[in-house]
């Protein structure tokens, strides 16, 4: 599912409200049949939701691998053997992003923008989420890296992970989504399948022209 709209439309705020970063004043957030709008972010993460935020938000001084391990923190007991219990998840992320394996001991803050985006997505995957929020995964990246990121998004979708994608490149977002919403001034203005939105004159003029 994709959420598109101009800067300031409320997309990132919506993502934060879903993931527990802020608490909505109205409405409900339902995850797997359970209302979660009053829970904090860590409790929502334990229920199976992971958030790859706008701007990546990696922990610069920590190594790539330590950043990834933090993603598993919500679901694994904190005792001796924690790293070993997460080894299969690390291998999965490294298979998706071989560059991260090469740089596993490197400080995350020294990575390129594209590598940091891979790390942010990988960190979210370490939680084994049922639902994954991706906020502007292509922001600031070179076109060739954007293509790689969207190939990964398509692969995650094929694996059965439910994805909510906020993306500045509306055309790319519609190519991977099954359904999409257009947000304007904090409200849903248009919604439909990618095929329907691609024929909508209002959407074409504002986002696809």
Where are these regions (language model features)?
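Glycine-rich phosphate-binding loops of nucleotide-dependent enzymes
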Residues: 1-209
């Amino acid at each position: 599912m994709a959420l598109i709209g101009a800067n300031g439309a409320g997309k990132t705020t919506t993502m934060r409200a879903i993931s527990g970063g802020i608490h909505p004043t109205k409405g409900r957030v339902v995850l797997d049949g359970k209302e979660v709008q009053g829970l904090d972010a860590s409790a929502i993460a334990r229920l199976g939701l992971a958030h790859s935020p706008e701007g990546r938000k990696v922990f610069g001084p920590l190594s790539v691998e330590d950043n990834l391990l933090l993603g598993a923190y919500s679901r694994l007991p904190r005792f001796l053997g924690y790293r070993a219990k997460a080894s299969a998840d690390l291998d999965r992320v490294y298979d998706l992003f071989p560059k991260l394996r090469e740089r596993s001991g490197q400080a995350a803050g020294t990575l390129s923008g594209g590598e940091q985006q891979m790390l942010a997505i990988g960190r979210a995957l370490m939680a084994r989420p049922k639902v994954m929020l991706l906020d502007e995964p292509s922001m600031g990246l070179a076109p060739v890296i954007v293509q790689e990121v969207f190939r990964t998004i398509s692969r995650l979708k094929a694996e059965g992970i439910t994805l909510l994608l906020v993306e500045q490149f509306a055309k790319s977002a519609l190519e991977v989504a099954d359904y999409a919403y257009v947000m304007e001034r904090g409200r849903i203005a248009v919604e439909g399948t990618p095929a329907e939105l691609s024929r909508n004159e209002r959407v074409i003029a504002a986002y696809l022209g």
